[in-house]
Design a protein with these regions (language model features):
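Charged, amphipathic alpha-helical coiled-coil/dimerization segments
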Residues: 2-15, 91-151
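Active-site phosphate/pyrophosphate-handling residues
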Residues: 26, 58, 147
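Short amphipathic alpha-helical segments with heptad-repeat character
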Residues: 28, 32, 36, 80, ...
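N-terminal helix-turn-helix DNA-binding core of bacterial DNA-binding proteins
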Residues: 36, 40-82, 96, 168
């Protein structure tokens, strides 16, 4: 019986740790490997089906959540990328008629970026397919395992938030 071989990039990622390493390190590398495998399929799907990229999808997702639009600095912060990256992506989406820049009242230099009607339609189609790809990524796991992973990762996330708060408080002292 042939066991499917992991993709080389994932094999390399998990090969960084061995049984003598802390189980937390092995878990971290496993989480990264899973994330990279899913993201790889999503990136390929966005490129193949919508001729777009994950960063463009992510920017449009932020704008979809904020119909009034977001300032460039807010977009940069939410996407955790530089202002230059946001400007480049926004320029492309403006040229394609998917987003627009709208002047902010009372501030001649500031603009909000928001989806156009065409952008809303385009993003809705992408978001529907994106959700399906994510559902498919977990299709081999029973629902109870997905629920358990969700709970456990929620606990991990909360733990990390608390650790970050403590670290920031220590830095202020």
């Amino acid at each position: 019986m042939n066991t499917p071989r992991p993709e080389p990039a994932v094999l390399d990622l998990e090969a960084r740790a061995h049984s003598e390493h802390a189980r937390e390190l092995r878990l971290w590398l496993r989480l990264l490997a899973c994330s990279q495998l899913i993201e790889k399929r999503v990136r390929a799907g966005l490129r193949e089906h919508f001729d777009t990229t994950l960063p463009r999808f992510d920017l449009m997702a932020q704008l979809e959540r904020h119909p009034e639009g977001l300032k460039m600095k807010e977009l940069s912060h939410r996407l955790m990328v530089t202002g230059g990256n946001v400007t480049g992506i926004t320029d492309q989406l403006v040229a394609e008629g998917l987003v627009e820049r709208v002047a902010v009242d009372g501030d001649r230099r500031a603009f909000r970026v928001r989806l156009t009607p065409a952008g809303q339609t385009s993003f809705a189609a992408m978001a529907e397919q994106h959700e399906q790809w994510i559902v498919e990524a977990f299709a081999d796991l029973p629902a109870r395992d997905v629920d358990q992973l969700h709970r456990l990762l929620g606990r991990l996330k909360q733990s990390q938030i608390e650790i970050n708060r403590r670290l920031q408080a220590d830095e202020l002292e």
